[in-house]
A protein has these predicted regions:
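Active-site-adjacent alpha-helix of alpha/beta-hydrolase-fold enzymes
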Residues: 145-154
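Hydrolases whose catalytic domains are alpha/beta-hydrolase-1, hotdog thioesterase
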Residues: 1-6, 10
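Active-site loop/turn elements of alpha/beta-hydrolase fold enzymes
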Residues: 23-26, 135, 159-161
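Catalytic histidine-centered segment of alpha/beta-hydrolase-like enzymes
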Residues: 162-171
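Flexible "cap/lid" loop of the alpha/beta hydrolase fold
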Residues: 12, 16-53
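Conserved serine/cysteine hydrolase catalytic core
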Residues: 84-146
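A generic "structured core" feature
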Residues: 163, 176-180
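Conserved alpha/beta-hydrolase catalytic His-Asp/Glu region
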Residues: 49-104
Length: 184
């Protein structure tokens, strides 16, 4: 959706053909309060003495992802952790990813407003599957329902017991995606 709003959109999209689109708990309006929540920790670079300590912190941030087995939690957390030369643990991502986000928050000088992406969503022209965690704070239910009536008129699938965002590790989450993509 962001490409649709880029100044060089036509050049970017030339020759690009998307047959089917899956949106995972991201919609035409993103909750400003949820963006504020994410802004509290994006860009942080904590280090941890043990892998268990690092896993516990990451898991506490991902609690909205819903129920998972211990192996699934280890998979999710280990993917974002790396050991350091001194035997400690750190998050594995570029903290500079937060710079534009934090600059935008500072420029607002107050609560973050909802991000209105309706013009971008309405420009989507392919069949679209919209996945939503039933307790998502980023994608309000009313927006998800509106997305089934506008633009590509997405097919909405919600997952109980999940917030932002479904991890797509469980069969009940993968099944709808596989079925949707098989329709192509």
């Amino acid at each position: 959706m962001l490409a649709a709003g880029h100044p060089q959109r036509e050049a970017f999209l030339a020759g690009l053909h998307i047959e089917r689109l899956v949106l995972n708990d991201a919609g035409a309006v993103l909750s400003g309060a949820a963006l504020d929540r994410i802004g509290l920790y994006v860009g942080e670079t904590p280090t941890f003495n043990t892998l268990d300590e690092a896993r516990a912190m990451v898991r506490s941030r991902l609690v909205t992802f819903g129920a998972h087995t211990q192996d699934q939690w280890d998979f999710l957390t280990d993917a974002v952790l790396r050991s350091t030369e001194d035997g400690r643990w750190r998050l594995h991502y570029d903290p500079a990813i937060a710079a534009p986000f934090k600059a935008a928050l500072l420029a607002l000088n107050g609560p973050t407003p909802d991000a209105d992406l309706w013009p971008l969503y309405d420009a989507i022209a392919c069949p679209t599957l919209l996945l939503r965690g039933a307790e998502s704070d980023l994608l309000p239910r009313s927006v998800a329902e509106d997305m089934t009536q506008r633009g590509p008129k997405a097919t909405l699938v919600e997952f109980a017991g999940v917030g932002h965002a479904p991890t797509l590790l469980n069969e009940d989450q993968m099944g709808p995606i596989l079925s949707f993509l098989a329709e192509a």
